[in-house]
Amino acid sequence: ERTHTGEKPFECPECHKRFTRDHHLKTHMRLHTGEKPYHCSHCDRQFVQVANLRRHLRVHTGERPYACELCDAR
């Protein structure tokens, strides 16, 4: 609903950046607080966003989901 209106009612009290969704502000606030709630179970790494943890886990699993467009290497 707010996607195309430009409305951003959620403002960061630290840097005044504005967001369309409250959960985007919540995630952004972790940059200011240093909170990293997502922990790797294989090493000491911690992450602000779960998507970053999922991407990091590929280091441990050896998963290489993207192939080179030129030689098909992964």
Curated annotation (Swiss-Prot):
> Sorted alphabetically, which InterPro entries does this protein's record hold?
Znf_C2H2_sf, Znf_C2H2_type
Entry-linked PROSITE patterns: ZINC_FINGER_C2H2_1 (PS00028), ZINC_FINGER_C2H2_2 (PS50157)
A GO-annotated cellular component:
nucleus
Q: What is an example of a GO molecular function annotated in this UniProt entry? A: DNA-binding transcription factor activity, RNA polymerase II-specific
Keyword terms of this UniProt record: Developmental protein, DNA-binding, Gap protein, Metal-binding, Nucleus, Repeat, Zinc, Zinc-finger
Where is this protein localized, as stated in its record? Nucleus
* Listed SMART domains: ZnF_C2H2
- GO BP terms: segmentation
The stretches annotated as zinc fingers (C2H2-type) lie at 1-4, 10-32, 38-60, 66-74
- Gene3D superfamilies from the UniProt entry: Classic Zinc Finger (3.30.160.60)
The reply to whether Flavoprotein figures as a keyword in the UniProt entry is no
Question: Which domain of life does this protein belong to?
Answer: Eukaryota
> Which function does this protein serve?
Krueppel is a gap class segmentation protein.
Which family would the database say this protein is a member of?
Belongs to the krueppel C2H2-type zinc-finger protein family.
UniProt name for this protein: Protein krueppel
Gene name of the record:
Kr
